[in-house]
């Protein structure tokens, strides 16, 4: 089968690799000059199935109001005259109930755990090196209230059979000795022993190279304009460099996915949520993190990547803005300096921002659409690196008509249809805009 994958981030590249491995003729189209140059470029670096959680959670609306007045707020909302933003925020609110949170987290952990296993398989079969470490991650709580609130997450972890350790302050220091100077600011932690870390950019570029050696064609510097539709079926994609015909098209364009499928009558509830990172060279290895420490107060992950520390996180709902406010850099620097003071040279930090494609329930959209020939693998939010390998394997199985190894029916776009109604396409493209 001829398959065109739109997007060369970690999700698109892993999809292309799995589809080629299954015997398909695959072409990847991306506007950038190489793979992983947008959201996959400098993310926080953690592969954290156990930490997979929706942003929509009980108590978040009240916290969001308090965060409005915090200097180092983990969430910033910049209201816009944007109907998509309003729909997204209202849908987030609807998912802030205990029942919705438990369902969404369980679904996310299921996919993330499977994805970690698929990544282990990829690492073994390809030999790729990407500054990976298999030493768990530590969710750090600065207050007893945060520690107590972890109870609902622990219930989901137990139900899913995910290994964890609930630690006091001394236990946190045993896991991460570099925290010793911050002991008086630690109430406890939740250590997820099966989690990993690694450089998403290095992995994606390496896998793209292997995929190309295996026959996948990459068309970089090529902008996607519109899907080609004939007889109610997607038959290819029109780009700035011509039309690519296909038996199937996979949309893995992150936050840009909704605009592409909207003319086909599909409302895809994916919205860009801006995240930030700084990358700092290590100058004192004894003070640096061993793996990933997630600062629960500021929603910031501090990760060791070889000889560097990656500090990433926060969330800013501001449309497609790519500005780099100094205040966001200050928050990242404050967090790493507070917990791992002296570990890195902040004067040489590089500052980056990316747009995470978020869904209201935190779960990506993976699978077929009501439009024949059109498939989705998008909406992974902050967990694209964590979920990419598993999402790609699930998608490949579905395209080939195989039953995936995990439950996947609740990963598709159908879950957003109104109760009692199936999502239906409304293909109304102007024939004059289609390729002949």
From Swiss-Prot:
Its EC number is 1.4.99.-. Pathway: Amino-acid degradation; D-alanine degradation; NH(3) and pyruvate from D-alanine: step 1/1. FAD binds at residues 3-17. One of its GO terms (cellular component) is cytoplasm. Its cofactor is FAD. Keywords: FAD, Flavoprotein, Oxidoreductase. It catalyses: a D-alpha-amino acid + A + H2O = a 2-oxocarboxylate + AH2 + NH4(+). GO terms for molecular function: D-amino-acid dehydrogenase activity. InterPro entries: DadA, FAD-dep_OxRdtase, FAD/NAD-bd_sf. It comes from the Bacteria. The keyword Oxidoreductase applies. PANTHER family: D-AMINO ACID DEHYDROGENASE, SARCOSINE DEHYDROGENASE-RELATED. Oxidative deamination of D-amino acids. NCBIfam families: PRK00711.1. This is D-amino acid dehydrogenase. The gene is dadA.
């Amino acid at each position: 089968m001829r398959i065109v994958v739109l997007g060369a981030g970690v999700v698109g590249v892993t999809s292309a690799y799995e589809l080629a491995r299954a015997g398909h003729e695959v072409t990847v189209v991306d506007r950038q000059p190489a793979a992983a140059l947008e959201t996959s470029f400098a993310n926080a670096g953690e592969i954290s199935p156990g930490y997979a959680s929706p942003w929509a959670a009980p108590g978040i609306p009240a916290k969001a109001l308090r965060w409005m007045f915090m200097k180092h707020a983990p969430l910033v909302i910049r209201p816009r005259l944007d109907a998509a933003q309003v729909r997204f925020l209202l849908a987030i609110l609807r998912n802030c109930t205990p029942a919705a949170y438990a369902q969404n987290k369980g679904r996310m952990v299921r996919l993330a755990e499977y994805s970690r296993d698929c990544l282990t398989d990829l690492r073994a079969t390809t030999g790729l090196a990407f500054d990976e470490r298999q030493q768990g991650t530590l969710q750090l709580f600065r207050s007893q209230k945060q520690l107590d609130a972890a109870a609902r997450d622990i219930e989901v972890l137990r139900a899913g059979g995910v290994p964890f350790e609930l630690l006091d302050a001394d236990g946190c220091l045993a896991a991460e000795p570099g925290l010793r100077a911050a002991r008086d600011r630690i109430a406890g932690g939740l250590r997820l022993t099966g989690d990993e870390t690694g450089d998403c950019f290095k992995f994606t570029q390496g896998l793209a190279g292997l995929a190309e050696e295996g026959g996948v064609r990459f068309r970089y510097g090529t902008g996607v304009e519109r899907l080609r539709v004939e007889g109610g079926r997607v038959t290819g994609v029109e780009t700035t460099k011509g039309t690519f015909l296909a038996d199937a098209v996979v949309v893995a364009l992150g936050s840009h996915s909704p605009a592409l499928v909207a003319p086909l009558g599909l409302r895809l509830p994916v919205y860009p949520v801006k995240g930030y990172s700084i990358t700092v060279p290590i100058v004192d290895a004894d003070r640096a993190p061993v793996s990933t420490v997630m600062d629960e107060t500021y929603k910031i992950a501090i990760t060791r990547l070889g000889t560097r520390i990656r500090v990433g996180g926060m969330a800013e709902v501001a449309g497609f803005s790519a500005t780099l406010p100094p205040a966001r850099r200050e928050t990242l620097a404050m967090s790493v300096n507070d917990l791992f003071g002296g570990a890195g040279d902040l004067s040489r930090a590089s500052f980056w921002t990316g747009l995470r494609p978020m869904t209201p329930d935190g779960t990506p959209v993976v699978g077929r659409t009501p439009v024949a020939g059109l498939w989705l693998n998008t909406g992974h939010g902050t967990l694209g690196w964590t979920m990419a390998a598993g999402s790609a394997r699930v998608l490949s199985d579905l395209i080939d008509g195989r039953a995936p190894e995990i439950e996947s029916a609740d990963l598709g776009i159908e879950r957003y249809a109104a109760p009692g109604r199936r999502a239906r396409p409304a293909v109304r493209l102007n024939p004059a805009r289609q390729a002949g």
